[in-house]
Curated annotation (Swiss-Prot):
Signal peptide positions (record): none
UniProt-recorded name of the protein: Phosphoglucosamine mutase
Function of the molecule: Catalyzes the conversion of glucosamine-6-phosphate to glucosamine-1-phosphate.
Source species of the chain: Frankia casuarinae (strain DSM 45818 / CECT 9043 / HFP020203 / CcI3)
GO biological process terms held by the UniProt record: carbohydrate metabolic process; peptidoglycan biosynthetic process; UDP-N-acetylglucosamine biosynthetic process
Length: 455
């Protein structure tokens, strides 16, 4: 049986892969598992459990929100609905309000027809795999009880939780952003209103791009996965920095004043060095995934900073950070976790840390990113093959071993199946772009021929 939860919650085409019925069932099962049998008592032992619910701007978010709220309230949970909000705002609201758990409706960077459900446990942390599995099993069973009368949940709108999140973000800034001109691309998503508001409150001169909150156009040629319009806008407006969020604003990429892209690895390198300089980088350690550029590893080694590597997914980065007590980690894609200020990847917080560093040093972003040199990296996505055999197919394993031997210490090869899409990713790094591209294309061809078609 295919697991319902992927690496970042439940995701698929809304109304086909993810229906209102499934959303209601999942919400009800989550209350059963996370609140337990005594659902008239919340975490403090007083009153019903409270669940925070937020969504991005996708049209399908409206009916999915209605279904989730119905499932929660019918199962005896009170609902604090915060409306359109970044994913990390839901996590913060759960932690700050003492809610039992939180639900975010978003498919992040995926196209508009998709949607998804992410759950946050008490304290604002993403759920462990075993808890997600328990919820999935519970979905197959009838409800253990149906509250009636005063025991059913009540629903209220709580926009004040977003205001508190914004205030929390602003409190993390080391210095005001006065004098900085910033272009922020909100991808027509969850940060469309909040990101420009927070940056202006911090003192920046803000140009807002793709910030109408038009969910029909979410991630369409905009945001963290489509940086061309941001690059052009930064140059056209003479901005100091460009900031790009994805649909749910849990990640952030940047653009320097010349229009050059600054990826998650460069952001992490810059922030790691800043924290180490202040003596705030716990154990001089940063946590990244296997996708981080080899150039990042080289830069950290030269700075005396230890790098701990995890599987792909900010949830695994976070688990490793919590286990080791580390304060900084993230992904090349722009999910960055500052564990001393957040419980999950936070695009708005990351933007403020980038801009704060520019403001306090007086150095251009392009100068700060020279902390590391990226090795050429080529990523090829192979669709239509059985991704479950990536780690077991002998022909493919031999091809990977040969490629690694060819590149030696000056390059890297990584093959993995996507946790959110039906594809296999082939990633190669090498001393030159041509070498990386040649090896990647060769391995992609082996993937297509060695692996059977997807079922």
């Amino acid at each position: 049986m295919v697991r319902l939860f992927g690496t970042d919650g439940v995701r698929g085409v809304a109304n086909i892969d993810l229906t209102a019925e499934q959303a209601l069932s999942l919400a009800s099962a989550a209350v059963e598992v996370l609140a337990g049998p005594n659902r008239t008592s919340g975490p403090s032992g007083r009153g019903k459990p409270v669940v925070v619910v937020g969504r991005d701007t996708r049209p399908s978010g409206e009916f999915l929100e209605a279904a989730v709220v119905a499932g929660l309230a019918a199962s005896g949970a009170d609902v604090a609905r915060i409306g359109v909000a970044p994913t990390p705002a839901v996590a913060h609201a759960v932690a700050a309000s003492g809610a039992m758990f939180g639900v975010m409706l978003s498919a992040s960077h995926n196209p508009m027809p998709d949607n998804g459900i992410k759950l946050f446990a008490a304290g604002g942390l993403k759920l462990p795999d075993e808890v997600e599995d328990a919820i999935e099993r519970r979905m197959a069973l009838p409800p253990s009880r149906r509250p009636v009368g005063a025991d059913v949940g009540r629903v209220r709108d709580e926009p004040v939780l977003l205001d508190r999140y914004a205030a929390h973000l602003l409190a993390t800034l080391p210095v005001p952003l006065d004098g900085l001109r910033v272009v922020v691309d909100c991808a027509q998503g969850a940060a469309s209103t909040l990101a420009p508001r927070v940056l202006r409150a911090a003192g920046a001169d803000v140009v807002a791009l793709h910030a109408d909150g038009d969910g029909i156009a979410i991630n369409d040629g905009s945001g963290a996965t489509h940086l061309d319009s941001l690059r052009a806008a930064v140059v056209a407006h003479g901005a100091d920095v460009g900031i790009a969020h994805d649909g749910d604003a849990d990640r952030c990429l940047a653009v320097d004043a010349t229009g050059e892209v600054v990826d998650g690895d460069q952001i992490l390198a810059m922030c790691a060095l800043a924290l180490a300089e202040r003596g705030e980088l716990v154990d001089d350690t940063v946590v990244v995934t296997v996708m981080s550029n080899l150039g990042f590893h080289h830069a950290m080694r030269e700075a005396g900073i230890t790098v701990v590597t995890t599987p792909v997914g900010d949830r695994y980065v976070l688990e490793t950070m919590r286990a080791g007590g580390y304060v900084l980690g993230g992904e090349q894609s722009g999910h960055v976790v500052f564990l001393d200020h957040a419980t999950t990847g936070d695009g708005l917080l990351t933007a403020l840390r980038i801009l704060g560093r520019v403001a306090e040093t007086g150095q251009p972003l392009g100068e700060l990113t020279k902390a590391m040199t990226r090795l050429p990296q080529v990523l090829v996505n192979v669709r239509g093959v059985d991704r479950t055999q990536v780690d077991t197919n002998e022909e493919l394993l031999r091809a990977v071993a040969l490629a690694k031997a060819e590149l030696g210490d000056e390059g890297r090869v990584l093959l993995r199946s996507s946790g959110t899409e039906p594809l296999v990713r082939v990633m190669v790094e090498a001393g030159t772009d041509a070498a990386a591209r040649a090896v990647a294309q060769r391995l992609a061809a082996v993937v297509r021929t060695a692996l059977p078609p997807a079922r």
